[in-house]
Amino acid sequence: MRPVFVADLGDLKEALRLEPARGPTAALVFNLGSDVGGSFEAVADVALASRMPTMFEHRAFVDAGGLASYRLNWDRQTQRNAVQIDKLFRGERPGKIPFELPTLQEFVLNLKTARALGLAVPRTLLLRADAVVE
């Protein structure tokens, strides 16, 4: 795996075009800039057209056709934050509220994309997935 920062769709296309020349790579992990943020389908289409397995930091890319994502489960984290804020509003002193690190990660896998790339997904990986997009 090789991490790649992408600021826009042009960077994404260029990274995917250049990657084969850099030697064997099993997959690319993308950290996408804000200019790409809402272009989920366009990013997933470019990644799929490259035939390179890709992993994203946001589930929306997987729902749009990307292969996989692994990230903090923000819904769960927001709930935990609300519990801590509630304690503050009820008068508990901030120093008495234990600090909580985020612990719940979410792994999402797109089987349709895996099939399109000709990837065999091991059963153990399917069992580890928190969500599978068919």
Give short role names for the model-derived ranges:
Residues 1-134:
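Short hydrophobic alpha-helices and adjacent helix-cap/hinge residues
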